[in-house]
A protein has these predicted regions:
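Active-site helix-to-loop segments that bind/position phosphate- or nucleotide-bearing substrates
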Residues: 1-13, 56, 81-311
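Generic structural signal for well-ordered secondary structure
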Residues: 31, 43-47, 249, 260-261
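A surface-exposed, charged beta-strand/loop segment in the N-terminal or early-internal portion
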Residues: 24-27, 34-37, 42-116
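Short, exposed beta-strand "edge-strand" segments with a Pro/Gly-rich flavor and a Y/T-containing core
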Residues: 20-27, 43-46, 54, 145-147, ...
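N- or domain-start disorder-to-order transition segments that initiate the globular core
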Residues: 1-31
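Short, charged N-terminal helix-start/capping segments
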Residues: 32-41, 187-193
């Protein structure tokens, strides 16, 4: 990023291979001048000329780390977010009826996309039929019922999610080279979304099955992308409408990712259906949880980003 002949010249960094680097040039007073510029995981330095140019044109510079968390903000008014958008977040969350309507619509869209994933990526079975029926009922209830609180919305979501992942049970995973890289017997088929590495209480985190590890990683990649985009768009990532969170947690990003989850599921299901894995693709940790190898993680990130991978 530098000033050349009175213009701001920005050149993309290298994030993956192969990649064509793009150049951007902005003129003072340009109608297309962005209100904020976001850099992600950058190194190097900025000249005082660049800082002065940004300040003069009222452009906010936001520096994020690779996770999408803020590192620094350079803003003329000391505030990086868009006041109008943040006010909408605050007012929608504070208004009980508006918050419920937001949540019902969000979860309704999530279940509708889940229905498509069930129909297109899960083989016909009794459990698939049950999940499809529950999804249709859930969509109808969310569109037509009046809810007293968020717990009623979450109850519908939970019932549909339970049936949704139950329909995945029995999905086969293909393996190669198991003599050289043996895998646990429990990895031959998919049994459920909960992790055995979490003890008595079933939870989705700390995956103990490869499919769940793939899902968790894909969700994390998407969460990072959504957080960066939300910040670039001027929202406060910590101010959730449906979700609440501890200070600093990206509650609004947890809102945004809800309808994206079943889309991610579809991508992972399609990948699992056509890919033959090796035991070397996963690392088993001391507590029984499994993690993706760096090479597989790179491949999954490319799938989520819609980038073709070289074989």
């Amino acid at each position: 990023m530098r000033v050349e002949k009175g213009t701001l010249h920005i050149r993309d960094g290298l994030t993956h291979y192969p990649q064509e680097r793009e150049d951007y040039r902005f003129f003072k007073g340009d109608l297309d001048l962005p209100p904020r510029i976001v850099t992600v995981d950058c190194s190097g330095g900025l000249s005082f000329d660049v800082l002065a140019w940004l300040a003069e044109q009222g452009v906010t510079l936001i520096c994020l780390d690779w996770k999408g968390d803020g590192v620094s903000v350079l803003a003329c008014n000391g505030y990086a977010a868009d006041p109008v958008k943040v006010r909408w977040q605050q007012e929608t969350r504070a208004d009980s009826a508006a918050r419920l309507a937001f949540a019902a619509d969000l979860i309704g869209r999530k279940i509708a996309i889940s229905l498509t994933t069930l129909e297109q990526h899960i083989p016909p079975s009794r459990l698939q039929t049950i999940a499809i029926e529950k999804s249709r009922i859930g969509i109808d209830r969310l569109a037509n019922e009046k809810f007293a609180d968020l717990n009623a919305v979450f109850a519908i979501e939970g019932e549909c999610a339970s049936a949704y992942f139950a329909a995945w049970q029995g999905l086969a995973i293909s393996w190669k080279g198991t003599k050289r890289h043996p895998v646990p017997d429990g990895w031959q088929i998919y049994k459920g979304r909960s992790s055995l590495a979490n003890g008595v209480k079933p939870e989705n985190r700390n995956a103990s099955h490869p499919v769940n590890a793939l899902l968790n990683y894909a969700y994390a990649v998407t969460l990072q992308r959504l957080q960066i985009q939300a910040i670039a768009d001027g929202y406060d990532p910590t101010l959730g409408v449906m979700h609440s969170g501890k200070r600093g947690n990206p509650a609004f990003i947890l809102d945004l990712i809800e309808p994206e989850r079943p889309r991610i599921d579809a991508l992972i299901l399609a990948f699992v259906a056509k890919h033959t894995f090796s035991g070397a693709d996963f690392v088993i940790r001391d507590n029984g949880g499994c993690r993706l190898s760096p090479q597989l993680a790179k491949h999954v990130a490319a799938i989520i980003d819609g980038r073709p991978q070289r074989s």
